[in-house]
């Protein structure tokens, strides 16, 4: 599944190649998507390449080849459609400053410890940031003894960057929805209103560090304007 921003970039590249015969420059792509820097374009192109939609050709300027096109990329009018940044459920908005729509509440709890249902909202990366699916796919039952107050949701982990924190590929992480966290907390972090990742939060002066629990992955240090907290890890479910 591609993010809206990935789709928009693929659409723009396809139309520019159809009109001029050559791919757009990184500056043109940055301006078309209203991004602040070309690093965002690099990340989008890498994601599209990993998913098999684009191929970069070595030793050639503007060497981007479109390999395949999903139906969603080709609008009936052929026009390039702009969009506002979209993010993971728990932070998806029509504009970055707007608040997220409420998530489904946990259901069925009582004072006798009856299990409650937590919505599974998609996948989260414990590795290179990936897009998370924004719709509820199923629910998982949990004992209320493992949950504090507030709204909770679950995400399926993809990747191995948090293995030294005991979080493995395929685990379900249970997240308490909140937009703040303490240094040292493991959080769902949204980067550039586009990509979601599960990392340990560290504060370094005015910057935010997203720290992996696997020495094979580098810590990412970002400005506070580029990171939004979508929730804090409170529990983990693993099937054997």
UniProtKB/Swiss-Prot annotation:
Catalytic machinery residues: 161, 199
InterPro entries, A to Z: LexA (IPR006200), LexA-like (IPR039418), LexA/Signal_pep-like_sf (IPR036286), LexA_DNA-bd_dom (IPR006199), LexA_repressor (IPR050077), Peptidase_S24_LexA (IPR006197), Peptidase_S24_S26A/B/C (IPR015927), WH-like_DNA-bd_sf (IPR036388)
Catalytic activity field: Hydrolysis of Ala-|-Gly bond in repressor LexA
Presence of keyword Glycoprotein: no
Site (Cleavage): 126-127
DNA-binding region in chain numbering: 26-46
UniProtKB keywords: Autocatalytic cleavage, DNA damage, DNA repair, DNA replication, DNA-binding, Hydrolase, Repressor, SOS response, Transcription, Transcription regulation
Alphabetized GO MF terms: DNA binding; serine-type endopeptidase activity
Keyword Electron transport (UniProt): no
Biological-process GO terms, alphabetical: DNA repair; DNA replication; negative regulation of DNA-templated transcription; proteolysis; SOS response
Annotated EC: 3.4.21.88
CDD domains from the UniProt entry: S24_LexA-like
Recorded family membership: Belongs to the peptidase S24 family.
Binding partners and assembly: Homodimer.
Annotated function: Represses a number of genes involved in the response to DNA damage (SOS response), including recA and lexA. In the presence of single-stranded DNA, RecA interacts with LexA causing an autocatalytic cleavage which disrupts the DNA-binding part of LexA, leading to derepression of the SOS regulon and eventually DNA repair.
The name this protein goes by in its record: LexA repressor
Gene name in the database record: lexA
């Amino acid at each position: 599944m591609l993010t809206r921003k990935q789709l928009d970039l693929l659409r723009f590249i396809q139309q520019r190649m159809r009109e001029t015969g050559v791919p757009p420059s990184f500056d043109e792509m940055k301006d078309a998507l209203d991004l602040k820097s070309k690093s965002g374009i690099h990340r989008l192109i890498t994601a599209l390449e990993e998913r098999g939609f684009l191929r970069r050709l070595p030793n050639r300027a503007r060497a981007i080849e479109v390999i395949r096109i999903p139906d969603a990329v080709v609008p009936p009018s052929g026009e390039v459609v702009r969009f506002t940044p979209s993010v993971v459920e728990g932070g998806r908005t029509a504009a970055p400053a707007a608040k997220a729509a409420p998530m489904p509440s946990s259901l069925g709890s009582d004072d006798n410890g009856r299990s409650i249902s937590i919505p599974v909202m998609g996948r989260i990366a414990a590795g290179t940031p990936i897009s998370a699916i924004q719709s509820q796919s199923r629910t998982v039952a949990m004992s209320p003894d493992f949950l504090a107050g507030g709204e909770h949701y679950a995400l399926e982990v993809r990747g191995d960057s948090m293995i030294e924190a005991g979080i493995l590929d395929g685990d379900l992480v249970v997240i308490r929805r909140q937009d703040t966290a303490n240094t040292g907390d493991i959080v769902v972090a949204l980067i550039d209103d586009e990509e979601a990742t599960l990392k340990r939060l560290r504060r370094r002066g005015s910057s935010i560090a997203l720290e992996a629990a696997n020495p094979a992955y580098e810590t990412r240090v970002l400005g506070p304007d580029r990171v939004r907290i979508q929730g804090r890890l409170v529990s983990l479910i693993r099937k054997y």
